[in-house]
Design a protein with these regions (language model features):
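N-terminal transmembrane-helix/juxtamembrane module of multi-pass inner/ER membrane proteins
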Residues: 1-11
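Divalent metal-coordination and catalytic microenvironments
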Residues: 9, 31, 50, 93, ...
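Membrane-interfacial alpha-helical segments at the cytosolic side of multi-pass membrane proteins
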Residues: 14-21, 94-112, 142-151
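Aromatic-anchored segments of alpha-helical transmembrane domains
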Residues: 39-46, 119-128
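Membrane-interfacial catalytic/cofactor-binding modules of polytopic membrane enzymes
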Residues: 44-107
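Interfacial helix-loop-helix junctions of multi-pass membrane proteins
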Residues: 53-54, 88, 121-147
Length: 165
């Protein structure tokens, strides 16, 4: 499940890479815009709703650390040494993955169907590995979707993509 949680950044990298190397500049910059807006909205919301993750707020209720392979051990170490208090809502991992998922829907429909089960698994794993509450995941889905909707609106403006790589 830790691996599923860690996959949030892969979706944007894969989709962005395919669009970039396919020289689909409008698609590439659109997807980057969806993600940037989704992340930006999420950070603003987190400032107004500083929610601690279950990792801290429910720490006494667990029956021990999560058990798994080397990735789980690495994550447990990171959690102990560098975890941020008060930035659980909305889940930025989910927001970024959902924004990329919407980008795949709009620009590479087949990739959307490849991403979908992995994004759903990542959403479940965010709760399972104690990083977020279900409300954080729903908030991340809404934030990522808003990033997409606002990004589509912005990219429809003439000359929204003037850069060429």
């Amino acid at each position: 499940m830790q691996f599923a949680y860690f996959t949030y950044f892969i979706f944007l990298l894969v989709l962005g890479g395919i669009l970039y190397y396919g020289r689909d500049w409008k698609g590439y910059w659109s997807v980057m815009t969806y993600s940037a807006i989704g992340y930006g909205l999420g950070y603003v919301i987190a400032m107004f709703f500083p929610v601690q993750s279950p990792w801290f707020s429910m720490a006494g209720m667990w029956h021990g650390e999560l058990v798994g392979g080397p990735l789980t051990a690495l994550v447990n170490l990171i959690e102990k040494c560098g975890r941020v208090h008060g930035a659980a809502f909305p889940s930025q991992h989910v927001a970024g993955a959902v924004a990329a998922l919407w980008g795949a829907w709009r620009h590479r429909r087949r990739l959307f169907w490849v991403f979908l089960p992995f994004v759903l698994c990542m959403c479940v794993s965010t709760v399972y590995v104690r990083n977020h509450y279900v409300a954080d995941v729903i908030g991340g889905m809404v934030t990522g979707t808003l990033g997409y909707v606002i990004g589509v609106w912005l990219m429809r403006k003439q000359e929204a993509v003037a850069a060429r790589a």
